[in-house]
Amino acid sequence: MKNTLSFLLTLTLLVVGSITAQAQLQQPAASPAAHVSQVVGFTKISIDYSSPAVKGRKVFGGIIKYGESWRAGANGQTIIEFSTAVSVGGKNLAAGKYSIFVTPAATGEWTIHLNKKAESIYSYMKDGKIDEAALAADDAVAVKATPSTVGATERLQYHISAGNNKVAQVTLAWETTAVSFMVDSLVDQKMEQFKSQF
């Protein structure tokens, strides 16, 4: 009788514990993970990022300071990946992954950094601020881009436009601002290389 009672008590505790564990619902992320990809020519361009919301805040010049580099997303690093070699800002980049950092400006052009190190921007912290010189030293390329005003965009979004299927336009849009850079998939160069093999 004692064994039966002990068994029933143990079984009850296991069932209640299991139900309680299943009843705990994980909250949705405030800045959900997002992914966008596009094939342009022979190249697949992919971006993995987290998508923060405006939530009534002033974004650029507010929570994102002018003149300070930013990880161009939330939570972790924003990563762009090219499946083949490409050209950005007139500089050839090898296939692979790069961190995207953006330095917004109150007026004029912004700087978009494609950084060789797929690490957190916080690895560049020095005395409580981003060490801009150290970050720039690790850039694969930094391009200047003029921001434009767009319709309200609550969540940060990236878009990749295939254009003429040779050169892609990569755009970051958030709040009422968009900024873009071009990625040349080097289709003509790759075609010439292919033809030269025969």
Regions found by a protein language model. Give the residues of each.
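Mid-length scaffold segments of soluble, non-membrane domains
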Residues: 72-126
